[in-house]
């Protein structure tokens, strides 16, 4: 991405469960000024990063639900995720997808990053973000749970 003219820095966050990968990230940080490994972020810092970022990338190979995607959309950020069924289910057309199981996954990811940079924040209609985020608001989920429990209690 940066070799092809991309100007944004890549901030990596989260707990790495592999010493080898963590070592590799440390080496990568030393060799390029464009990669910054943040490690695990506390909630306040995580939300500050969402607010400050120009886009959110989530190239996960396996994902249970994908709450970080919903959180990034809450901040109306362009989101790029791996092409997994769970992301289609929760985010639909509000995010961009990238296949990670191909030989050219890295160039595809870099091209998608460049496209997001070119398009800017306008790359995703606000109405799509609002629709996705609205489905997962605490109030709505709590109401659905209450209704479910009341239905079970009547039987």
Q: For the regions a protein language model found, what residue spans apply to each?
A:
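Short alpha-helical donor nucleotide-sugar binding micro-motif in glycosyltransferases
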Residues: 48-53
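Aromatic "clamp/platform" in nucleotide-sugar-dependent glycosyltransferases that forms part
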Residues: 61
